[in-house]
């Protein structure tokens, strides 16, 4: 287990360990799962080695949950409706209470973006395919959904708020 891969030296050691059959778990700072490929390449790792050392990519964010004690249905603002879609007219928002220390939030929920590195993705990585191509394949063939899509669904379900969605998917 590697705590965090921040530089080329750590990335190289991790890739060599993975190539020789060791399961290596590490973290990278990226906006989404597929961007990990670019990040490793930026650290000087050859595309062929990236393709053959990865088995999966996971992006994870924690979203604060609306407090179940003070959460109330409220009308969306025009800005929120632009973000959420015209079909959404109400959302759940905490008003603040003793259970949530006045924040309107209590607890967190994990949102994941998962990509399995299969034979086709290995080929794409090896030939230096654009991230958009790999992402499109993961969506179409693996059913991958982005952090933003999953977060949006949680807002629609009343689990969290548009502010939390913007916080975890600021780049989208």
Language-model regions: role of each:
Residues 1-172:
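Short, flexible helix-loop junctions that flank or precede catalytic/ligand sites
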């Amino acid at each position: 287990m590697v705590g965090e891969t921040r530089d080329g030296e750590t990335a190289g050691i991790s890739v060599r360990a993975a190539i020789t059959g060791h399961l290596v778990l590490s973290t990278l700072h990226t906006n989404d799962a597929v961007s990990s490929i670019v990040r490793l390449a930026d650290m000087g790792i050859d595309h062929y080695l990236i393709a053959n050392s990865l088995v999966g990519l996971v992006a994870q964010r924690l979203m604060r949950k609306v407090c179940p004690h003070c959460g109330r249905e409220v009308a969306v603002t025009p800005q929120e409706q632009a973000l959420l879609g015209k079909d959404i007219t109400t959302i759940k928002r905490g008003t603040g209470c003793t259970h949530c220390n006045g924040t309107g939030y209590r607890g967190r929920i994990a949102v994941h973006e998962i990509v399995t590195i299969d034979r086709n993705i290995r080929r794409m990585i090896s030939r230096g395919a654009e991230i958009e191509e790999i992402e499109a394949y993961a969506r179409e063939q693996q059913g991958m959904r982005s952090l933003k899509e999953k977060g949006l669904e949680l807002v629609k379900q009343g689990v969290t708020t548009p502010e939390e969605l913007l916080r975890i998917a600021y780049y989208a």
